[in-house]
């Protein structure tokens, strides 16, 4: 399909720079194909679901993946900004760096805050390899838990570029950009639909008879990358690591066999569930990378409803929601959201999308 079909104009004023408080006070647009759009709030979610529905959240935890440093021996040069995007092993990370042209293979970068170092010593990394578009492979002097601790001490919250370009990240973001479910460290971007949940909403869902399940997909920085090719078939999707336990898969399959719907909280949960789905719609345990790219024409096998934020034009995520509800339906929904003052992107409002039962 032509990428331009997924383009739309979004006023800069629609981009949320802070979340609302409390989190479940965010607005939520309910989209049912063939039905009138409903303007609701996230706290209405229990009333919009049915007893027996299965809510699936992503429990990944965002790491402090934004590092600042300088090349050793080049103190007068501009600082090096590195965003860790993918763990390769116990001591190596793939990263996006700026300015990448300043780095060569073999260079050593010392990371810290204005020359300070973490308690474990200097956090140094050697540039092992350079790729396209600012990608490098960094080999750190620390390994395993020691490296994780050093990154946590020296790093900052890796806010999306559409927020970080408008304001400086601060300590509040360390809390705001983490879901209440965050448990397994490894993401460099938040599963943003989960940001809307509160203990009160969780309790109300349980009282409604909705069961909550957890999976893990470590969201990568590729989630922010626009589709630059003219045809979606030519786009190469980024890979992310995810796991679904056998117990979770069995519980979801049993509930669905009894008529319960699977409701994915976020596109990350949906992508992992669909990656693990068999042809008959049952879900298998999963522990692997997924690079699933969902565009209109995709046959959904596992997910019946999706709660998700509002996404970027020409993004793989807007393509995904267009596949879920139909391109024309989502174009109309986004026009309504923009005209009605909904807040977009990571800190913005939510949508609750239902697909046609016949396509189950």
UniProtKB/Swiss-Prot annotation:
Subcellular location: Cytoplasm
One record GO biological process: tRNA wobble guanine modification
GO cellular component, one term: cytoplasm
SUPFAM superfamilies named in the record: QueA-like
EC number: 2.4.99.17
Leader sequence residues: none
Record's keyword annotation contains Nuclease: no
Pathway: tRNA modification; tRNA-queuosine biosynthesis
Catalytically driven reaction(s): 7-aminomethyl-7-carbaguanosine(34) in tRNA + S-adenosyl-L-methionine = epoxyqueuosine(34) in tRNA + adenine + L-methionine + 2 H(+)
InterPro entries: QueA, QueA_dom1, QueA_dom2, QueA_sf
Complex and partners: Monomer.
Known function: Transfers and isomerizes the ribose moiety from AdoMet to the 7-aminomethyl group of 7-deazaguanine (preQ1-tRNA) to give epoxyqueuosine (oQ-tRNA).
UniProt family annotation: Belongs to the QueA family.
Protein name: S-adenosylmethionine:tRNA ribosyltransferase-isomerase
Organism (species): Rhodopseudomonas palustris (strain BisB5)
């Amino acid at each position: 399909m032509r990428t331009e079909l997924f383009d739309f104009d979004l006023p800069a004023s629609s981009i949320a720079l802070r979340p609302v408080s409390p989190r479940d006070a965010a607005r939520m647009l309910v989209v049912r194909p063939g039905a009138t759009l409903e303007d609701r709030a996230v706290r209405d979610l229990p009333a919009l679901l049915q007893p027996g529905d299965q809510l699936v959240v992503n429990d990944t935890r965002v790491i402090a993946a934004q590092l600042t440093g300088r090349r050793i021996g080049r103190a007068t040069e501009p600082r090096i900004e590195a965003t860790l995007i993918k763990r390769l092993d116990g001591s190596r990370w793939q990263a996006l760096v700026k300015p990448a042209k300043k780095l060569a293979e073999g260079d050593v970068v010392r990371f810290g805050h204005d020359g300070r170092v973490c308690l474990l010593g200097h956090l140094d990394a050697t540039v092992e390899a350079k790729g396209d578009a600012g990608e490098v492979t960094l080999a750190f002097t620390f390994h395993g838990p020691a490296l994780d601790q050093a990154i946590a001490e020296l790093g900052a919250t890796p806010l999306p570029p559409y927020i970080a370009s408008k304001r400086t990240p601060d300590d509040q973001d360390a809390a705001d950009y983490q879901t209440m479910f965050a448990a397994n460290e490894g993401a460099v971007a938040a599963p943003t639909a989960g940001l809307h949940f509160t203990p009160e909403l969780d309790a109300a869902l349980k009282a409604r008879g909705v069961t909550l399940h957890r999976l893990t997909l470590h969201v990568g920085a590729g989630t922010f990358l626009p589709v630059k090719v003219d045809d979606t078939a030519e786009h190469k999707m980024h890979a992310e690591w995810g796991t679904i336990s056998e117990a979770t898969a069995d519980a979801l399959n049993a509930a669905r066999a009894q008529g319960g719907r699977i409701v994915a909280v976020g596109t990350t949960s949906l992508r992992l569930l669909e990656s693990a789905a068999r042809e008959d719609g049952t879900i298998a345990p999963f522990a692997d990378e997924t690079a699933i790219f969902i565009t209109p024409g995709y046959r959904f096998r596992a997910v019946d409803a999706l709660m998700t934020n509002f996404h970027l034009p020409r993004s793989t995520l807007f393509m995904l929601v267009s596949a879920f509800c139909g391109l024309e339906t989502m174009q109309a929904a986004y026009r309504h959201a923009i005209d009605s003052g909904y807040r977009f992107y990571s800190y913005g409002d939510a949508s609750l999308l239902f697909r046609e039962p016949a396509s189950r």
